Amino acid sequence: MDNNPPTSTGKCPFTHGSVTASGKSNTDWWPNALNLDILHQHDRKTNPLGDDFSYAAAFKTLDLQAVKNDLKALMTDSQDWWPADWGHYGGLFIRMAWHSAGSYRIADGRGGAGTGNQRFAPLNSWPDNGNLDKARRLLWPIKKKYGNKLSWADLMILAGNMAYESMGLKTFGFGGGREDIWHPEKDVYWGSEKEWLAKSGGEGSRYSGERDLENPLAAVMMGLIYVNPEGVDGNPDPLRTAKDIRETFARMAMNDEETVALTAGGHTVGKAHGNGNAANLGPDPEAADVEEQGLGWVNHKTRGIGRDTVTSGIEGAWTTHPTKWDNGYFDMLLNHDWELTKSPAGAWQWKPVSIKEEDMPVDVEDPSIRCTPLMTDADMAMKMDPEYRKISERFYSDPAYFSEVFARAWFKLTHRDLGPKARYLGADVPAEDLIWQDPVPTVDYTLSDADIADLKAKILASGLSVAELVATAWDSARTFRGSDFRGGANGARIRLAPQKDWEGNEPARLQKVLGVFAGIQSGLSKKVSIADLIVVGGAAAVEKAARDAGVNITVPFAPGRGDATDAQTDAESFAPLEPVHDGFRNWVKKDYAVQPEEMLLDRAQLMGLTAPEMTVLVGGMRVLGANYGGSKNGVFTDKVGVLSNDFFVNLTDMAYQWKPTGKNSYNIVERNTGTVKWSATRVDLVFGSNSILRSYAEVYAQDDNREKFVRDFVKAWVKVMNADRFDLK
């Protein structure tokens, strides 16, 4: 007989009551530890479509016109569970698309419509995205019908396009190609506030000084897409709001004319909802009970739909005909005097001092009822700010011009984070090249393997060092951002302003190398771009360094890069791509509040690197002597220019200890003699101190992995060089 005491039966096996939410995480226990999660997100294991699925290939089999027809039919197919205002869902779908794209910020390229992230926290539950869950549910039958051929990300933007077209606007076009993600993004910093819609000046405020908005943020409050429609911190003052608008839209890569067009065009159709008490609404989607099935803000206390809907708390339409594309917004805004009032939900808004009944929009359910139109504080800024007023009057006097500017601005808003035109898919892609798409000329030459070998030989015989070739190729490619697919080596914009003058590109060294490449180019019998020469030069240098380490390897090189011109380059829009740090070259422009290793992690994520790829690249770049300015920090080798695993061997060798010599400065000292052997920075030390990174470093330090280190470095190097070669994907 078993004498062990009987176990309790029928009880929850998890004494804390939850499998996923209880207990402290490693980050809770060690909040200052380097968190590598941003490099481990979007793993293929979380993608239900599998490793072999190609969205681009699937999209090319999509009947795009059939989708557009279905979307157009949906616009007026009102559902009882969420009825359409005036029988037309256009305003709702436009707001959904606007808010999907409008989270983009140019500083780091993150946010935006490119991933379908509105389906996940925190965006799906932001106060500013209230009731957009209903819009996505209305789209579900269409998504279900077309399946894998049409991503949620593409569908949401296309729905916004078709909403405008169904109401009379000729849109500029549509490009598909946005691939869905399958869980929330971990790399996007939305702010450090601890509550939604926190006013400036409190804990974790995104503002400092007079009203300096923290980089890289664009929105003025946690949980808003852009500005507070009631005014700065909820206090109406159109001129103050205008300043917020100008800053926010500039950080979304929009100028004043585009800003007015987007504001007016967004409010030409649809309405705001605040005819009720927000206290009657249930929790947001992430906090809602399981029976709500992912829907939030559900009103179980009052009717809560149709004319009784509460979303932003602001109530009313902006124009007389809210389901028709016309010039009614400017007619209403400019031809009436406005006074402050509060909506039934208690939100600040503006109403006309007087208005003719026939100019009032009708009720969303009963056309015999006329309703008072509204303007938000942001709308009033379009009238009261002098520059915005000039643009508004121009648009009012020329409706065709307004429609054209808006259509182009809407296309830019919804496609800015899709990247260069080479990534666009579908029959509705506009033929015109736009400067914000960072166009690059198509090359008209090919190179054989013999041609490539000849180029490598010429470059190695040019007198340029391994370090110079590696650093130049790296600097050209490192600007790539997987967030909005900008930057990279294609186009060789490192030759042009502003990149040629960036401090991080070491202008003197850069001009020397470019001069040599220009000489090689002029002496060739075949056409080759400088962009290709820069990359093949890096490949030649890496091959030589590998040979010197005893490993014969060919660095794959795919020709086909063009050389962009100044006319194809918007210098101002490239300013946010300027590196102010690069841990791969052991450089920071100045002392920042953020630790250098955190900045390295951020750059690696933007470049699309995994943690092992980041590790092997740093170790290789150090021994190649590719540090900024020839710095010796982290160069743990006596064989500079040789692609050895010495960085990892010496990093993990207990014969040495590390001693601080400054805030970001260390000496490596021999334990037995006290002799200083090498110098280092935090970016070097972190590969020995962080437990995860050390595990990778130990792999590359092993005696049996010297060749593996070289091969892994080459693979990661080629990934960086080809990151913007969308034609190779």
Swiss-Prot record:
Active site: 99 (proton acceptor)
Site for Transition state stabilizer, residues: 95
Gene Ontology MF terms in the entry: catalase activity; heme binding; metal ion binding
Free-text cofactor note: Binds 1 heme b (iron(II)-protoporphyrin IX) group per dimer.
Cross-linked residues, Tryptophyl-tyrosyl-methioninium (Trp-Tyr) (with M-252): 98-226
Positions of crosslink type Tryptophyl-tyrosyl-methioninium (Tyr-Met) (with W-98): 226-252
Cofactors: heme b
Post-translational modifications: Formation of the three residue Trp-Tyr-Met cross-link is important for the catalase, but not the peroxidase activity of the enzyme.
GO biological process: cellular response to hydrogen peroxide; hydrogen peroxide catabolic process
Pfam families recorded: peroxidase
Enzyme class: oxidoreductase
UniProt keyword list: Heme, Hydrogen peroxide, Iron, Metal-binding, Oxidoreductase, Peroxidase
E.C. number: 1.11.1.21
Alphabetized InterPro entries for the sequence: Catalase_peroxidase, Haem_peroxidase, Haem_peroxidase_sf, Peroxidases_AS
One cellular component term from this protein's GO annotations in UniProt: cytosol
Top-rank lineage group of the source organism: Bacteria
Catalytic activity: H2O2 + AH2 = A + 2 H2O; 2 H2O2 = O2 + 2 H2O
Amino-acid positions noted as binding heme b in the UniProt annotation, renumbered to this chain: 267
Stated family: Belongs to the peroxidase family. Peroxidase/catalase subfamily.
Function: Bifunctional enzyme with both catalase and broad-spectrum peroxidase activity.
PANTHER family xrefs: CATALASE-PEROXIDASE, HYDROPEROXIDASE I, BIFUNCTIONAL CATALASE-PEROXIDASE
Protein name listed in UniProt: Catalase-peroxidase 1
Organism, scientific name: Cellvibrio japonicus (strain Ueda107) (Pseudomonas fluorescens subsp. cellulosa)
Underlying gene: katG1
